[in-house]
From Swiss-Prot:
PANTHER family for this protein: 40S RIBOSOMAL PROTEIN S15A
Keywords: Ribonucleoprotein, Ribosomal protein, RNA-binding, rRNA-binding
Name used for this protein in its record: Small ribosomal subunit protein uS8
GO molecular function, one term: rRNA binding
Organism: Petrotoga mobilis (strain DSM 10674 / SJ95)
Subunit structure: Part of the 30S ribosomal subunit. Contacts proteins S5 and S12.
Length: 134
């Protein structure tokens, strides 16, 4: 059992991305689904699919690359966990970070659900910074 399931998901995606895997399987949860939905909407992954295994389920994530077969590069250059179980990071509306000068996204868990930094600024809500993706 992992102490931080979201960090485990991000690590699995980062590792699969670095060896150019087509897909990666992750134990499912609603928070992970919300994070993957944002990553899909922002164009960092191709798609994800829920597979019912009779227990908690599995999320199969289809990764996205740019370039031809020979010089393939991951679309997602980096992904890091910000708020950890030992050190939670909360921000208000004025302190929502911009990732890589606006080229990346910060994913936040707010009172209105999981959303990107841009959406949180528009809705004027703060929350817990889950991760940065660029």
């Amino acid at each position: 059992m992992w102490s931080d399931p979201v960090a485990d998901m991000l690590t699995r995606i980062r590792n699969a991305n670095s060896v150019f895997k087509e897909s990666v399987e992750i134990p499912a949860s609603n928070l992970k689904k919300d994070i993957l939905e944002i990553m899909k909407k922002e164009g960092f992954i191709n798609d994800y699919k829920f597979i019912d295994d009779g227990k908690q389920g599995i999320l199969k994530v289809y990764l996205k690359y740019k370039g031809t077969r020979r010089d393939k590069k991951p679309i997602m250059e980096g992904i890091i966990r910000v708020s950890k179980s030992g050190r939670r990071v909360y921000v208000n509306t004025r302190n929502i970070p911009k990732v890589k000068g606006g080229l990346g996204i910060a994913i936040l868990s707010t009172s209105q659900g999981v959303m990107t930094d841009k959406e949180a600024r528009e809705k004027k809500v703060g929350g817990e910074v889950i991760c940065y993706v660029w």
